[in-house]
């Protein structure tokens, strides 16, 4: 199956609905052939529908003439069969066109979601610092579905409506110029209304998609942090923000749907007005002998065929506006700046020893606000290194730079003498196991969660890791043991979740380990269990520990004390206490009341 075209550079983001529609056309290029076939079928179905009233007029005239001279049943039956054949054929080719278009649009949705998924893996971490999860989810689900359904309902409809409108107009004038002018004159109002409604609804569709993304982002944040919201008594504040976003979504959705919903009843009114006008003028012309009765019957059908395209065109344009608004958000996401290409990075370490060097590292999240000013440190293989400091000192930032989640402003980070900037990011990531403060588990079995990211792991390896962290007995008491499903309803404590992620890191068996405040979310009793598990995990590996509780890093081989992006002290626990500097201040503040 074909993938859609890749996203463009950040300087080429769609600026408006028009450009996003052009981008959609480019994205549809792999399916031009089936789309053309679908449109041809639609054209055939439309043309058959257009000629049917003419055959109906012949049938009416034959019956009308036969009332005086005798009805020719063979001719009547033949006319009926022809009309049935026309309508059946028109429906068959129209169904075929719909089938093809639905298939294409589902492939388009699949391709877009695939492109978004691939894009997520290429985005730098700084993108996720500024965008909510809910907004990204909204683009993957709501916006892509809007594009797919809107294009599916509008492309063939628009073509059919235009062809039907032009074809019926030609046939009406060829049949009776005066009745044609009557039908068109009564429909001019429809054109005016359509132009007004489409011009007014465009901006509201754009606002609706944006507000929907804001809503998803807020709900996701409040759901994931509902305990914090309650604990801080911020329920009213959260509700106030929800009400604000909900009001914005309500207003934009109401306005867009109101203008869109006006089309059908207004077009229905125009159609009924056309029926009345045609009947009055047609009756006058029939009585004067200018036209036959069958022509009036045909024109009543033509009025419907003439006015329907107006409402269909309006609805199709409205759907295209909705697709364009959703396309702006999707293509804006796909056009986000990606991480620099590292395919040219050929450096590789066959056997990782674990020596790490930071050389005059300088970095910041904002161009004019450096966080790490001039960081240098040497870590020997197998050392247990703790990084401590006040909140905002740059501890986690250093680990993110080590993992090459961000690119340095200047300086170098080396692993076994090789700069990480010369290695592929995936190779750098494979060198580290991570246990973070915020545990991440997914819907799946315990076994699948523990073996995550490590193909070919045996059941014995999974169970051995769980025995080392003290989880094996608990898991085996579950109804299905290691095959028990883990989900939001699973009653795992914070400590058990942390032990599970430590077991995952053990199974991964990476040569270096990063422990980012892994005990900060557990109670003191559980901390002992988690600490023992982490000690087993770090044994024989170079390990980096970002510590909040300094009691957990007293046995570290090297403690780096950071303040405002620089190392201000380094040494062992005893050495740093003896210096009486920042480390002693941090340590004393935690234990002075104990």
Per-region residue spans from a language model:
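An intracellular "coupling" helix at the cytosolic face of ABC transporter transmembrane type-1 domains
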Residues: 125-126, 142-151, 155, 200-221, ...
